[in-house]
Amino acid sequence: MTIKDWYKLTFLIESDSEEIIIWKLNELGIFSFSFEYLIKNKNKKEVNIWLPVADWSESSRFGVEKIITKLLNINAPTNQFFDWSIIKEEDWLTSWKKYWAPELVGNHFLILPCWINLNEKFKDKKIIKIDPGAAFGTGSHPSTYLCLEKMDNILFSDKKILDIGSGSGILSVAARLLGAKEVCAVDNDYLAINATKSNFQLNFGNLNNLNTYLGSFNEVILKNQLKQFDFVLCNILAEVIKEMIPNIYKCLRNNGEVIFSGILNSQKDEIIKILIQNDLKLLDVSTRKDWACISAQKASDPT
């Protein structure tokens, strides 16, 4: 295995800027990052971002600085705001783990990084064991919270589930824990498909009840004729969701439901409008900080 070096980018933000930073990093395809409270100043957080040296040229790193500076309206010189360092692969493989801890979501879920032992006080929870590796987080993004909270109140027993943009596979695992008989996971990143399989195996000891598809959702739907799902889970960016809604409608059973997350509050009205235009009935909207989760239903065909 080739040993890689990693850039570590560190800077400080106001605590209430965390969500917009997460959104922008996800949009840029950057998933290896953490946020830490400062002991001496609870209104500030330290952001740490890890980027593989081989993939990030000087101009690319400057581009990230420029985007973040504009996003946060920073006037200070970049060399005073951003701190870059290089860490070795072997240090990276252990150092990033210290930023993750077990997290309770909803009434029943506990997200448990696989290297942490389960505390006995949580043994009655539905445990989602996750090994995020270097590419994916452990589910701490507010949009993931919202989706899991919504799922926590739904009966998935014997249902057929489609997870669009599966990422680490956390929603696929949750659906199976809630009793889903079949989970289909779709992602256009082979790392995500591998992570979904790995985390499914980690939780259930096998890949039974899981089917994975590599490619964009619209392409996969047409090629594999995926349809007749009871529930669709879609935790991705709003701009991508808008393009998928017509095909999501087609792959739902009558009375099937879809849960959309990854939507900023400022975008939810537009998404709701498109849902209604595509004959999907709005069921519920929930919010967490700057993010929204929308659930909708495909009505039965008229008889």
UniProtKB/Swiss-Prot annotation:
Cell compartment(s), UniProt: Cytoplasm
Recorded hits in Pfam families, A to Z, give:
PrmA (PF06325)
Main enzyme class? transferase
Q: Which chemical reaction does it catalyze?
A: L-lysyl-[protein] + 3 S-adenosyl-L-methionine = N(6),N(6),N(6)-trimethyl-L-lysyl-[protein] + 3 S-adenosyl-L-homocysteine + 3 H(+)
GO cellular-component term (any): cytoplasm
Residues that coordinate or bind S-adenosyl-L-methionine: 144, 165, 187, 235
Q: Does the keyword ATP-binding apply?
A: no
The keyword Cytoplasm is annotated on this UniProt entry: yes
Please cite one Gene Ontology biological process associated with this protein.
methylation
| Function recorded in the entry | Methylates ribosomal protein L11.
Q: Which family does it belong to?
A: Belongs to the methyltransferase superfamily. PrmA family.
Q: What is this protein called?
A: Ribosomal protein L11 methyltransferase
Write down the species.
Prochlorococcus marinus (strain AS9601)
Name of encoding gene = prmA
